[in-house]
Amino acid sequence: KDWPAEERLYRFDASNDFAVYFGDPDHPLPLAEAKTQLMTIRDSTLVTLRIALGIWNLRKHNPSLISPTGRIPITYDEILAWQGRRKHSYVSGGKRITDGYRPEDREEVRDDLKLASMIYLKGDRTIYINGRQQKSHFEGRYIDVTFWDYPSLFSGEKPRLQGVTFVPGGWMDAYASANNIYLAEIDRRVFQLHKHHEQHALRLAFFLADEWRSHAYDTHHDYIFTMAELLARSVIRVDKRNLTNRLAPSIEKSLELLRARGIIGSYECLAPIDKSKPQWGNDWLASRWRILPPESLLQSYMAKGIAQPSASTQARLSPPKHRRGRTPKGG
């Protein structure tokens, strides 16, 4: 994402109408320092943040895990596992030994969360409380984290990085009344996917759950993406060499898996691709896809007076008919 500099801050306008700032607007970093920090943001930063928000949304209902201030513990190893990262291993005595994630892997997750904690939101939104519109102003951190680690037992060694206590900023409270129960159920289903064998499905699900959450107060919920946009926003790399023989089948299989698991309500390609043509991969990347939230989430929005069903939403509140068969495995 390009972050233009505005006055003393880098900022951009998000698709949900919030102004997103890098750094505290009241105590801004020097622009040169802020730019240096921004350049360290990578694809994993977004994936890490989505995973942490999903874990928080699940654990906040567990009184043994959540603190009075709404914080929940998350270890770096949990996030690395959901990213699909493999643990370090080596061969000894003819056997392969696994000794966990490398310290530098944990440092990457720590850096991701530290960068995300420097993001601030500011803006006015119309929210719905008991079916009535109400103007609200939001300003503050996107997330708040406290880092913890274990001191080393040996002099000169670095502490062992463990994890964070994590809580979203106050912006989350505004959305809680809209979709709290239903999004928690979606997150529960997402975290039942396989960490390694269903990574494409996980990346798509993390993005789409984030989309349902951040656009909860939109009046319409027709989500249309080009396939290239869907992959980019889901942080899925496009392998051009294996586009038609591996990536495209895996993504379409993953979408069907998400529908079968109730993580999305329905999906369709608005102009089907002629896959009998040679080199159809670019057409597939440019194709437009409509993806709807689960029926339970849409109906809860309409019951609360938040959403108004468009013609396409109304027609697709029930999942489309699919051939019977086993639930697909992977992505």
PLM region spans:
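Charged, alpha-helix-forming regions
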Residues: 1-331
